[in-house]
Amino acid sequence: MHLNTLSPAPGSHKARKRCGRGIGSGIGKTGGRGHKGQKSRSGGSVRPGFEGGQMPLKQRLPKFGFTSRKSLVRAEVRLHELNLITGDVVDIHALKDAGLITRNIVAVKVMLSGEITRPITLRGIAVTKGAQAAIEAAGGKVEE
């Protein structure tokens, strides 16, 4: 057996359809585009959301809500996610290094979800009452 003699099993690779290469191909002449019209022309199509001049759905519906600016710099971390951090001291830099929060986050709060399996020290991170109790029950502590 040599590299130049290798070939796929018969029938395992279907040949691709060659568009517009004669009527025998099954998709010759118009090449699957139908007859005439804007979408049959080269470069001819309408932008996403265009409804032929009718007022588009996006503009017919009212605006609502907004994005809180606080949500862009604050994050929540679940208690069981702290198990992913290797060190004993957990601060914002450790969370960023572990990939649990993005780099633009400046404030973090730990929520009670799951369980912590080892003692850790939280530094400069807010916690809920339940999460604090769970951390202290595991032998850890929370520092402000």
Curated annotation (Swiss-Prot):
Q: Which family does it belong to?
A: Belongs to the universal ribosomal protein uL15 family.
Please give the GO cellular component terms listed in this UniProt entry. cytosolic large ribosomal subunit
GO BP terms, alphabetized:
translation
**What species was this sequence derived from?**
Colwellia psychrerythraea (strain 34H / ATCC BAA-681)
Return the Gly residues bias intervals.
21-31
Q: What is this protein called?
A: Large ribosomal subunit protein uL15
Q: Which SUPFAM superfamilies match?
A: Ribosomal proteins L15p and L18e
**Entry's PROSITE patterns?**
RIBOSOMAL_L15
Cross-referenced InterPro entries = Ribosomal_uL15 (IPR030878), Ribosomal_uL15/eL18 (IPR021131), Ribosomal_uL15/eL18_sf (IPR036227), Ribosomal_uL15_bac-type (IPR005749), Ribosomal_uL15_CS (IPR001196)
> Self-association or partners: how does it assemble?
Part of the 50S ribosomal subunit.
* Keyword presence, Repressor: no
Tell me the segments the record calls region Disordered: 1-58
Q: Can the keyword Ribonucleoprotein be found in this entry's annotation?
A: yes
Q: Which GO terms describe its molecular function?
A: rRNA binding; structural constituent of ribosome
Q: What does this protein do?
A: Binds to the 23S rRNA.
Keywords (alphabetical) are: Ribonucleoprotein, Ribosomal protein, RNA-binding, rRNA-binding
